[in-house]
From Swiss-Prot:
Binding site for Zn(2+) 2: 102, 104, 132, 135
Residue positions of the active site: 106 (proton donor)
Catalytic activity: dCMP + H2O + H(+) = dUMP + NH4(+)
Organism listed in the record: Enterobacteria phage T2
Manner of cofactor binding, per the entry note: Binds 2 Zn(2+) ions per subunit.
GN (gene name): CD
Protein name: Deoxycytidylate deaminase
Family: Belongs to the cytidine and deoxycytidylate deaminase family.
Enzyme Commission identifier(s): 3.5.4.12
Length: 188
């Protein structure tokens, strides 16, 4: 399977997320086959982020105007639903809630593979957002040998990529607009 196809599948998987801030998707591919997927969200049976945010009043109606580059909007929109966005002033409260209640896409994909008895040794992980340091440590320990990501999380602590590279994992950043030319970035 072409890397550009797998990356697009990761984006589609991200749309299953109920997070009102970031919708993140991860796909683990090995020998040309998808063996696991994951998206960020609450554990099964837990309260979903979008529902909790609505109850807490963290959401705004999505503005109908186009945001001009460099303009600071009143809200942040990172793949949220078509109608609502997380209000900027509630981003830190959301982050605190999310860190206690949501599992990241990368870890969900790794756990799904483990739960189903699929070896990810030597696999490639495609993810729509750069991993946090905790996910980078999990990826480093998992046996994955290559990570391909699109966007860089703006609040990420530095060094997550060093964790991966120090574990011998190749790391590639592929901007969304270059998905068709992904072979230029990661040789697939």
């Amino acid at each position: 399977m072409k890397a550009s196809t797998v990356l697009q599948i990761a984006y589609l998987v991200s749309q299953e997320s109920k997070c009102c801030s970031w919708k993140v998707g991860a796909v683990i591919e090995k020998n040309g086959r998808i063996i696991s997927t994951g998206y960020n969200g609450s554990p099964a049976g837990g309260v979903n982020c979008d529902n909790y945010a609505a109850i807490e009043g963290w959401l705004l109606n999505k503005p109908k105007h186009t945001i001009i580059q460099g303009h600071k909007p009143e809200c942040v929109s990172f793949g949220t639903s078509d109608r609502f966005v997380l209000a900027k002033e509630h981003r830190s409260a959301h982050s605190e809630w999310s860190s206690k209640n949501e599992i990241h896409a990368e870890l969900n994909a790794i756990l799904f593979a483990a739960r189903n008895g699929s070896s990810i040794e030597g696999a490639t992980m495609y993810v729509t957002l750069s991993p946090c340091p905790d996910c980078a440590k999990a990826i480093a320990q998992s046996g994955i040998k290559k990570l391909v990501y699109c966007e860089t999380y703006d609040k990420n602590k530095p060094g997550w990529d060093d964790i991966l590279r120090n574990a011998g994992i190749e790391v590639f950043n592929v901007p969304k607009l270059n998905w068709e030319n992904i072979s230029e970035f990661c040789g697939e």
